[in-house]
Amino acid sequence: AALFVSIHADALPKREGDAQGATIYTLSDKASDAEAEKLAEAENKADAIAGIDLTEEPAEVADILIDLTQRETRTFSNRFARTLANEMKNVARMHKHPLKSAGFKVLKAHDVPSVLIELGYVSNKADLQQLVSESWRSRTVASVAQAVDAFLGKRVVLATP
């Protein structure tokens, strides 16, 4: 896969406040804030990169290969997250800090740029109104598609010799 996008809507118990707006998460070993940390699951170390089994490699070699691949993938993930936030801000109410990072399991692929989009909070009245609006969902999907097209187009240009 050239890109992985996981789309969610969240809820927050009343006692934890009134979160609102869309947020885009990328993978990080350390959460960008307490809210991101609460949403993320514990990290598991993967054994393969791009389908290559590293279990037979010396641990040092496997760790170096995983680290190099993760660095490049995180750079691409962060670049896509910025592109996505730029597209989404025209149609979606964004969180006051729309770009965050945390150790979500769904973002663990070492070799595929990945983001998790929280479109909003069903526990917030204004967000819920947007989430149930077919028109809003269509516009939001279109903005995500534009971001994907823009990102993949740039990657093709960068990869062309």
Show the residue positions of the predicted features.
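Active-site-proximal helix/loop segments of hydrolytic enzymes
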Residues: 1-161
